[in-house]
Each structure stands twice: as C-alpha cells, then as structure tokens.
Design a protein with these regions (language model features):
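Phosphate/NTP-binding elements of NTP-utilizing enzymes
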Residues: 1-147
C-alpha cells in the first residue's frame, strides 16, 4: 500500500477528508489514526497519544492491528469509516494486486446493522469530497464499489 497523500494531509484538506472527523472533539481520533498509519506526530499530538496509549512515541510505521477500549457513542464507526475511505480511495494498492485483480476493503462489525452504519459513513466521506466522489462506481445494500 502506497499512500498518494498522507492521512494528515487528507484530514486537513476539505477537498479530501477534511470534513470527516473535523473539530476539537475528534482530535484524539485524528491523532490515533495518524499514528496508526505510521506518520510522525507533532509535539502537541504526541502528548495526546501518550495520554491515550501510555506510549512515549508513535510507532512510525503503519500498524497491522488497532485495538482500543471505547464506550458507546465514542466515534468508533465514524473514525474507522474515515480511515477505510483513506485506504480505499487515497492509497495505491498496485504493489499488492496483480493486473486485473480488485482490492476489497472488508469491514467486520458486530452485526449487519453496525456494518451498514460504517458503510454509510464511508459513503458519506466519499460523497463529501469532490475528488473522492469521482471514484464511486456503484453502491449496493452491502458494498461500495470504487474504481
């Protein structure tokens, strides 16, 4: 996976994902997701990262797994939909796919209701971006196809 832009850049650009998890109340999620993608944090972000994880430094490489204890209405679905949109729409996967193969971003959830919520959030991320909106090929009840 080769990012076309960093997650930080995407989350800062209103033409990409800048409106997805904007505002002060989403700062913790932005910090965790940026760190999870292996990007370096600023000092103010590192303080938040340390407070949330107990770690002094971010990993500086993309992580394979992310686990967090987050209560109800803690923003999990919207945050995961945002990073899923980033991975599906703003990263190049030619290094992992053979010509003609289509990538699939699988979102596993507690049940179909929660999976649909995440899919709806991801679709909204694509739709709100004039750039990402162009990537939508098809939407069905349980899938969002992008090209």
């Amino acid at each position: 996976m080769i990012p076309r832009v960093t997650l930080r850049e995407a989350l800062s650009d209103p033409n990409l994902l800048g409106t997805a998890i904007a505002g002060d109340s989403w700062m913790s999620w932005r910090v965790l997701l940026i760190a999870a993608m292996g990007e370096e944090l600023r000092e103010d972000e590192r303080a938040i990262f340390t407070q949330l994880t107990g770690r002094e430094r971010e990993p500086l490489q993309r992580i394979d797994q992310f686990a967090a204890i987050v209560g109800r209405r803690g923003g999990k679905s919207k945050a995961i939909a945002t990073v899923a949109t980033y991975i599906a729409g703003l990263c190049d996967h030619r290094d992992a796919l053979v010509p003609g193969e289509r990538g699939v971003l699988l979102c596993v959830a507690l049940d179909q209701r929660v999976a649909k919520i995440i899919l709806d959030y991801a679709e909204a991320c694509f739709e709100r971006s004039p750039i990402l909106k162009q990537l939508i090929a098809n939407r069905t009840a349980d899938a969002l196809a992008v090209c």
